[in-house]
């Protein structure tokens, strides 16, 4: 985002995406997923070693970003990116689905929750800030080894529509 490190963009369906721990690699350290013109996810792997030793948990972190909030920061340098709780610019999506778990071991996937999926139908759900489903699920989140995470990504999955069936006599 601010040229801190290299991103690989996920835009097509792919399996076994390889993601080494952020502090343990000289290759790709995060994936970028475009959700809309202005919104995106950043996916990174954090391991409790080196500068991350004192993290409350480890695993895959999913950040939700909004260029409408981030771009003004680049020009004004005013730290207002997350000043409005209902309209934040860059924030974590905790695996627990509870925003209060950001600073706990329930934040990373699978982490203490054991949550291995982030889809339109999970908690937390893969949605835009306005609640629109993304159709871009991240599934089968798992450890490949001690410091590498693997996951599957699907692109532009159609939304599931359900009809209500009523029975009358």
Residue ranges and their predicted role:
Residues 158-166:
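Proline-enriched interdomain boundary motifs that mark the N-terminal boundary
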Residues 9-159:
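Non-catalytic C-terminal accessory/binding modules of secreted extracellular proteins
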């Amino acid at each position: 985002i601010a040229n801190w490190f290299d991103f690989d963009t996920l835009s097509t369906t792919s399996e076994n995406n390889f993601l080494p721990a952020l502090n343990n690699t000289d290759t790709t350290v995060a994936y970028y997923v475009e959700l809309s013109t202005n919104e995106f996810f950043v996916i990174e792997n954090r391991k409790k070693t080196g500068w991350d030793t004192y993290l409350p948990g480890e695993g895959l972190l999913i950040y939700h970003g909004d260029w409408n909030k981030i771009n003004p920061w680049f020009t004004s340098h005013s730290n207002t990116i997350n000043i409005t709780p209902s309209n934040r610019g860059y924030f974590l999506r905790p695996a627990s689905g509870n925003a209060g778990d950001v600073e706990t071991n329930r934040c990373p996937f699978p982490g203490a929750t054991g949550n291995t999926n982030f889809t339109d139908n999970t908690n937390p759900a893969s949605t835009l800030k306005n609640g629109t489903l993304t159709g871009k699920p991240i599934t089968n989140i798992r450890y490949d080894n001690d410091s590498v995470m693997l996951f599957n990504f699907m692109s532009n999955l159609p939304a599931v529509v359900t009809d209500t069936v009523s029975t009358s006599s």
